Amino acid sequence: MVTVEEVRKAQRAQGPATIMAIGTSTPQNCVDQSTYPDYYFRITNSEHLVELKEKFKRMCEKSMIKKRYMYLTEEILKENPNICAYMAPSLDARQDIVVVEVPKLGKEAAQKAIKEWGQPKSKITHLVFCTTSGVDMPGADYQLTKLLGLQPSVKRFMMYQQGCFAGGTVIRLAKDLAENNKGARVLVVCSEITAVTFRGPSDAHLDSLVGQALFGDGAAALIIGSDPDPDLERPLFQLVSAAQTILPDSGGAIDGHLREVGLTFHLLKDVPGLISKHIEKSLNEAFQPLGIHDWNSLFWIAHPGGPAILDQVEEKLELKPEKLRATRHVLSEYGNMSSACVLFILDEMRKASSKEGLNTTGEGLEWGVLFGFGPGLTVETVVLHSVSA
């Protein structure tokens, strides 16, 4: 007769969880940030709001974003005028879009990750799906399982309405699943479509306007597992530790509420200040056990909530400008894609490291950090170890 301890030991993986593949996707419709204010005020029938349009132009200019991808085309918006209004009942129309398109966009990213991984999809044991774009039953995890043709026995976990920190959450969860289930291969998918938050401008709700200047659509997928088969699988990053915390005195700093008018977005002015004030504490807690105190010795993957957050974090920690290069690149090319952003940055970092001939996947460095920030204010901190190129 075996003991529970023996069974437990046999169930666990030996080594740390590793990211084995990354895939990303966006809708085809690309919007240029420099011309977006004209388009946005025209499509929402708001051109009479001249001063507000000038304000929005300045927001877009300061955003450090060159372009974004959006499922909502001019044609779709013309067919759904309530989505273009500031506060018109429109949840049904938004839901009809996202419950179909969120899993579809996730499928494109997942297929790329599975292709890079190079193993049959029947080996996927777990699915973790995250979106802040709409809710449904059965969820986007179920729809993706069907779209990809995964095994009906795949163990699914669906996270709705977590917001911008959730790219860190899905990695933390997948790490625990991979390390506690021998042979587990976890497909992680974040898929975000701004059809839930798009709305016309209003003088009374400038934080909503900030969202209209920043948010873009995108999906990203990872394959995560422990003890990679050296003949068949190629690790990209090892996941060393993962933590979540709620920042003190930050209640109400970022809120979202699902209403008849869609998902409303509320933002306090001092979000960058709150994050930069507390970020060093999170870093110390994560890296003290490793004896690391030089934040410039790390490679950095930070959720690009907006340029002000990145600027204040950089200043507070005295980071060299190149530390947030991959993060700023993704913000510039895609905008803020909520939970998917940090996965896009991981992809950008390993590709740029390879292209530049650096000797690790983390810009030639050994240790790195991944930060997710979002409603709460909630912060996810993941310690990464790069892999030799």
UniProtKB/Swiss-Prot annotation:
Matching CDD domains: CHS_like
InterPro entries: Chalcone/stilbene_synt_C (IPR012328), Chalcone/stilbene_synt_N (IPR001099), Chalcone/stilbene_synthase_AS (IPR018088), Polyketide_synthase_type-III (IPR011141), Thiolase-like (IPR016039)
Keywords (A to Z) from UniProt: Acyltransferase, Flavonoid biosynthesis, Transferase
Pathway where it operates: Secondary metabolite biosynthesis; flavonoid biosynthesis
Highest rank taxon of the organism: Eukaryota
Pfam family, one: Chal_sti_synt_N
Active site: C164
TM stretches of this protein: none
Swiss-Prot/TrEMBL catalytic activity: (E)-4-coumaroyl-CoA + 3 malonyl-CoA + 3 H(+) = 2',4,4',6'-tetrahydroxychalcone + 3 CO2 + 4 CoA
GO biological process: flavonoid biosynthetic process; polyketide biosynthetic process
Enzyme Commission numbers on file: 2.3.1.74
Coiled-coil portions: none
Record-level Gene Ontology MF annotations: naringenin-chalcone synthase activity
Family membership noted in the UniProt record: Belongs to the thiolase-like superfamily. Chalcone/stilbene synthases family.
PANTHER family listed in its UniProt record: CHALCONE SYNTHASE 1 (PTHR11877:SF80), HYDROXYMETHYLGLUTARYL-COA SYNTHASE (PTHR11877)
Role: The primary product of this enzyme is 4,2',4',6'-tetrahydroxychalcone (also termed naringenin-chalcone or chalcone) which can under specific conditions spontaneously isomerize into naringenin.
Name used for this protein in its record: Chalcone synthase E
Organism: Ipomoea nil (Japanese morning glory)
Gene that specifies this protein: CHSE
